[in-house]
Amino acid sequence: MRRRSFVRGLTATTAATGLGLTAAGHGHATAAAGGGNRPAGNARPRAAAWREVPVPAGEPAVLLNAVAAAGPDLAWAVGEEARSGSTSGRPLARTWDGSAWQATDVSHLAFAGSLRNVAAAPAGAAGAVAAWAVAYDRAGAGHLLAWDGATWREHDFPGRGESGTELWAVAVAPDGTVRISGTRDGGSRVLRSDDAGGTRWSWSPPLPTDDGTAPSLWNVHVDGAGATWVSGGVDVARYDDRAWHVLPRLAGLRLSVTDLLPTAPDDIWLTGHDYGAGGPPGKPPGVVLRHFDGTAWSDVAAPFTVGSLGAIAPDAAGRPALIAGWDFWDGASAHYLRWDGTAWTSERGPAAAQGVTPVMSALAPIPGTGGFWSAGTTAQSPFPPAQARIERYG
């Protein structure tokens, strides 16, 4: 699913402010506003049915930005390898064959950069491409990729190769048509396929913003009614193929939105982190979890407050189900949140090896199973020796 990588968010924050998490530890570093020490008596919940699943290593630093599943026997994870801080490396892809994750050869992709996002077509979508991915080229171009059964191949789209045209995230509607958030002609837009095979494409009008800027739309989703939802910066909006409907702007001093889950126009969930005002180098962010009720955004209590929430995933009915998080005070395992119908409750992933800090930035439900894939990296910062990490529930 599409979701902005926590590590990528850290990189953007570091580039803009000189802050990052490289100096953060698990004990006495300065917390973000609203954080503080872990409350006494807040015991670590058991790991439930989570387990780590081996994934082929790449050249560090390795980041998995997104994961998507077509079913129990086929899934895709995408990202990059050979990254160093804010300098992108090379595209990296992995494929689940029903028994193990395999390395996917993408050496034919003749660009340096990152595979940003991946989305799978739903079962039964006539004529649909099995999966789509979007990529970032360090030279400044956007790339659309289609799965051909063995690897990822470049796919044509209007604006391909144009300076200033960028593709951020991808989603597939129930009928197999595709929605991509991107930038073209100086505006933030949605690129839509008119057919499931991706032979005809059209761009939306630009997203209207209060300040006239064009935010990077890191997140895109299609709701049950077929409307496209996007988020970027402090902007969240819905495009119904006729017009934009912009929600109230998000409050936050140094806010990064990592993911978005719209279930209805009056039921929208949002995850991320916010560094707040001031603080020394190495200050960790505070968790952001918000809900929109059709009128206003409200903060929702999370089981931990210092760290980041990296992704949110629905259940088979499209209802909120699971959030992946990184807990600053206890980073020895991923800190998941599960929706019980009234509140988000703690659920821990498998314990990591010494020196490994799981930062899970992507989630995907596994159709037909009730399970989930979770993908990310093994360190707080995008430097060697960070490697890919994949966990599975169910």
What are these regions (language model features)?
Residues 5-25:
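N-terminal export signals
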Residues 10, 34, 38-394:
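Residue-level hotspots at or immediately adjacent to binding/recognition sites across diverse folds
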Residues 24-35:
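Signal peptide processing junction and immediate N-terminal pro/mature segment
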